[in-house]
Amino acid sequence: MLTIYNTLSKAKETFKPLDGNKVRMYVCGMTVYDYCHLGHGRSMVAFDLVTRWLRKSGYDLTYVRNITDIDDKIINRANENGETFDALTARMIDAMHEDERRLNILPPDQEPRATDHIAGMHAMIQTLIDKGYAYAPGNGDVYYRVGKFVGYGKLSRKKIEDLRIGARIEVDEAKQDPLDFVLWKGVKPGEPSWESPWGPGRPGWHIECSVMSTCCLGESFDIHGGGSDLEFPHHENEIAQSEAATGKQYANAWMHCGMIRINGEKMSKSLNNFFTIRDVLEKYHPEVVRYLLVASHYRSAINYSEDSLRDAKGALERFYHALRGLPRVAAKGGEAFVERFSMAMNDDFGTPEACAVLFDLVREINRLRDSDLEAAAGLAGRLRELGDVLGVLQLEADDFLRAGAEGKVDAAEVEGLIQARLQARTDKNWAESDRIRDQLTAMGVVLEDSKGATTWRLAD
């Protein structure tokens, strides 16, 4: 039975979909003004993992992740570049999809864009005005009346009184309350705009997600996800808007993934420790980066460092070494490992424990490979099956272990030297065998002798 930590209740809860076996999940996606950074990658991989496990568990999942394609940052970057906002967002969306493909992230079922839902935003804003939850002061803006929504703060546990006392609030004479937030922004010179009942302008960030989620999934749905940095104010404001407009509970469960830290510090441009996904993939195999992101629990912060990446690479090498040399057959045996893996994943997607099961499975494969090849191969199939839930271990073992060899060594030359060494060993010419091994070592090639075969990989 699956349990999920619900940020709304601050507790693990048994997961019960609203509609039988059907699950509807919405995740806040990218604001596409720049290349995706590792924090985006963390969120994308975390909810890809959730998607894979829900489907593996037999749920009929509809996964929606939005694209914010109009925003202050987008407008500013487009102006800096001397291009239109939609030209910028088109490039960045293509780049995001390429990053996802390389990290083996499954595409969402729907990927709505904010600019395609302007009419829906007008409708929800008008509903909020009609119900007294929003007001138009006459300057082209429309604001949400925070004080009217009784449940404000229920997600973040923040109190309106404390927010008023503790916040550094900019004076805005158009607001009735300093905590009120914008639903519709009146047009400014040089900015893209859309016609509306309140004059030309563009939507505020928070209303975009309320409209896209309810348009795609209905007024109430099962899971709403995103990074922990979105809990307040973005997700708090989504709840306030949506529940005031519909009179219904917005999302049943709220899931938030942890942040990325760089060598123990928060990742930020100001600290000059900011990495895009493509920066990291220049140095590390995509599966290494993905494993780093799934091996920690999704709610935990991840420390990104050279050491952590080396650890991730080492773990994958152990897995692929176990798979190497075994025929690809259907998963067979290892039911106890499957049960332990499932228990871990059903406990709020407990990937650290799930990964520990994979290591135990590797030990069993290695124990059997010289005595019972058929059993070892069946367990290797099981390892790939469970690895697929994490989005790893689907490559050919040699392809992973030799990744990066292109341009560094000539594979044909290496294979020729290995064959010459095998012949020398057959002839009991140990001096020649050692000489060839030394030559390969000097080339950065590591040989691994096993029963009846020699394989190779590049040294770290």
Curated annotation (Swiss-Prot):
A motif ('KMSKS' region) lies at residues 266-270. Its main location: cytoplasm. Its cofactor is Zn(2+). InterPro entries: Cys-tRNA-ligase (IPR015803), Cys-tRNA-synt_Ia_DALR (IPR015273), Cys-tRNA/MSH_ligase (IPR024909), CysS_C (IPR056411), Rossmann-like_a/b/a_fold (IPR014729), tRNA-synt_1_cat_dom (IPR032678), tRNAsynth_Ia_anticodon-bd (IPR009080). Pfam families: CysS_C (PF23493), DALR_2 (PF09190), tRNA-synt_1e (PF01406). CDD domains: Anticodon_Ia_Cys, CysRS_core. Zn(2+) binds at C28, C209, H234, E238. Binds 1 zinc ion per subunit. GO terms for molecular function: ATP binding; cysteine-tRNA ligase activity; zinc ion binding. Keywords: Aminoacyl-tRNA synthetase, ATP-binding, Cytoplasm, Ligase, Metal-binding, Nucleotide-binding, Protein biosynthesis, Zinc. SUPFAM superfamilies: Anticodon-binding domain of a subclass of class I aminoacyl-tRNA synthetases (SSF47323), Nucleotidylyl transferase (SSF52374). GO terms for cellular component: cytosol. It catalyses: tRNA(Cys) + L-cysteine + ATP = L-cysteinyl-tRNA(Cys) + AMP + diphosphate. GO terms for biological process: cysteinyl-tRNA aminoacylation. SMART domains: DALR_2. A motif ('HIGH' region) lies at residues 30-40. Its EC number is 6.1.1.16. ATP binds at K269. The keyword Ligase applies. It is found in: Cytoplasm. Belongs to the class-I aminoacyl-tRNA synthetase family. Monomer. This is Cysteine--tRNA ligase. It comes from Pseudomonas putida (strain GB-1). The lineage of its organism: Bacteria, Pseudomonadati, Pseudomonadota, Gammaproteobacteria, Pseudomonadales. The gene is cysS.
